[in-house]
Amino acid sequence: MESLLLDKIDQPSDLKKLNAQQVEKLCAEIRHFLLENISKTGGHLASNLGTVELTVALHRVLETPKDKIVFDVGHQCYTHKLLTGRRKQFDHLRQLDGISGFPNPHESVHDAFIAGHGNTALSLAIGICLLYTSDAA
């Protein structure tokens, strides 16, 4: 499958230039990319296939890194990684010296936290909410 649209997405702002038909095509390209790459490197496939449209939609309306995205479980972030400039590094997903299978702020300013499993998501979201609604913000 030729990835014409995915090859042109290097940052979330690129998504805002797409029309609805292109977004639908992009989501299909992302699924194909994930299937192809995860079959080589291993990783969390189902959770990522289930969040493609959601992640694309979030990046079309939010402005990361200013806005923070908290994933239910960190290993749902593969589409997020593709949309934030790490597509070319996917050959080394979860490999030595490769990109992490979880959000990691050392990889990208678009990753707010290092988070893996579900119990951290609620705590992170509450913390962000408290920060932005407190007098300290």
Please tell me what each predicted stretch does.
Residues M1-N37:
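Cofactor-/ligand-binding subdomain signature composed of acidic, glycine-rich
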Residues E2, H44-S134:
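Cofactor-binding active-site loop characterized by glycine-rich and histidine/acidic residues
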Residues Q11-L15, L35-G43, E107-I114:
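Glycine- and acidic
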